[in-house]
Amino acid sequence: MRIFNQTEIRIIGCLIEKEVTTPEQYPLTLNALTTACNQKSNRDPVTSMSDSDVLDSLNTLVSERVVTDETRGNSRVAKYQHRFCNTEFGSLKLSKQEMAVLCVLFLRGPQTPGELRTRTQRLCEFDNVAEVESVLTTLGLSEASPMVTKLEKEPGKREARYAHLFCGEVINDVTVVDKTNVTNHSNSTENDERITLLESEVAELKAEMAQLTQLVNDLLA
């Protein structure tokens, strides 16, 4: 399995996400892709990559055919799309749910099954958390190479987190917390997740408006 660096995996995650959520803007220009990489919503960590940072990694991914330049006709603006999975001659074939789970793990880092169910809503549908866990099990038992791993449960959390392995082995960063805070933290988890989802949806709408504005500017350039 190809091991990517953090910038490369952020680019791949953004291209997968935007292919589904904003198909009218896909493939993405360099400016739109940089904006997507640096979104404040649905990104952890939040980054401040330059166009040059993104382009350097894009050139590597294009040379390896993980990403392709889809510039057509007389267009002066390069546009990029991923070939990470489900290509005609590629070996990595993923279901819509599997691709959505990996996409969120690429963009947000380790997640619990409950968080994944919430945060994949714009990419696919899961009927329940058990369905997410089934997909994670499938990804973890891939015949070619495991694509996800289960981390140790964090103190105060009801669910263990899962991480992708496309950037190599994951060091489990379980945080030690004061036992007196565990109960309160556990009780507030569901409310925090609902608030986070609403904030994320508002921020994503703002980001998509910014990308649409950038697309119009690119077309008028």
UniProtKB/Swiss-Prot annotation:
Matches recorded under Pfam families: DUF480
UniProt record similarity statement: Belongs to the UPF0502 family.
Protein name: UPF0502 protein VSAL_II0605
